[in-house]
Amino acid sequence: MIGRLRGTLIEKLPPQILIEVGGIGYEVQMPMSCIYELPNIGEEAIIYTHFVVREDAQLLYGFNTVSERALFREVIKANGVGPKMGLAILSGMTANQFVTCVEKEDISTLIKLPGVGKKTAERLVVEMKDRLKGWGAGDLFTPATDAAPVDSTPVIAQNAQEEAMSALLALGYKPPQASKAVSQVAKAGMSSEELIREALKSMV
């Protein structure tokens, strides 16, 4: 099992990144809340991974901290929640925000996440509330920030919007929903990561 990768960040194609370790490039699926905190392209990154083996694929899911990975593993234990939905949940909100929603039984916020209906939201609360006691205390997760993403490479607006749309669709949002969210938050000069961040905020 691959549990940790340390290497050079080669690409950010949200919600996927490419990290090179010992001359080998690993494709890793990451929640947007974690991608925002990554270093610049070309710099060293440390990713804690969860390895999933399916009949048709072998997938790596990555996180910036051991605690974020642990939360992801708890989320996908819930009945009816797989890795793809777990990724979408932790992209729509930070780990701390998710823990708070579960603790407060905030169903109305959880159902705004892609693929999460009322029954799934209720199941998450019922199954996870006791398991997550104490998780919201202290600095267990990557601190949430409203600052711009660290990658300041200029991006052509149209390309940024296309990349943002692709990321939202990969996370499970419907095309009309994704298009509307991106259009509403788009501003001149925004990078694709900024667009994704603001679009996700507008839908939660």
Curated annotation (Swiss-Prot):
Region annotated Domain III sits at 156-204
Q: Which UniProt keywords apply?
A: Cytoplasm, DNA damage, DNA recombination, DNA repair, DNA-binding
The compartments listed are: Cytoplasm
Please name the GO terms that the record assigns under molecular function.
ATP binding; four-way junction DNA binding; four-way junction helicase activity
UniProt key word Repressor? no
The family database entries (InterPro entries) matched by this protein are listed as: DNA_helicase_Holl-junc_RuvA_I, Hlx-hairpin-Hlx_DNA-bd_motif, NA-bd_OB-fold, RuvA, RuvA_2-like, RuvA_C, RuvA_C_sf
| Ranges for region Flexible linker | 144-155
The UniProt entry's GO biological process terms, in alphabetical order, are: DNA recombination; DNA repair; SOS response
Q: Which domain of life is it from?
A: Bacteria
Q: A single GO CC term, please?
A: Holliday junction helicase complex
Which stretches does the entry tag as region Domain I? 1-64
Q: Does the keyword DNA repair apply?
A: yes
Q: Which family does it belong to?
A: Belongs to the RuvA family.
* Oligomeric form and interacting partners: Homotetramer. Forms an RuvA(8)-RuvB(12)-Holliday junction (HJ) complex. HJ DNA is sandwiched between 2 RuvA tetramers; dsDNA enters through RuvA and exits via RuvB. An RuvB hexamer assembles on each DNA strand where it exits the tetramer. Each RuvB hexamer is contacted by two RuvA subunits (via domain III) on 2 adjacent RuvB subunits; this complex drives branch migration. In the full resolvosome a probable DNA-RuvA(4)-RuvB(12)-RuvC(2) complex forms which resolves the HJ.
Q: Which NCBIfam families match?
A: ruvA
Q: What is known of its domains?
A: Has three domains with a flexible linker between the domains II and III and assumes an 'L' shape. Domain III is highly mobile and contacts RuvB.
Q: What is this protein called?
A: Holliday junction branch migration complex subunit RuvA
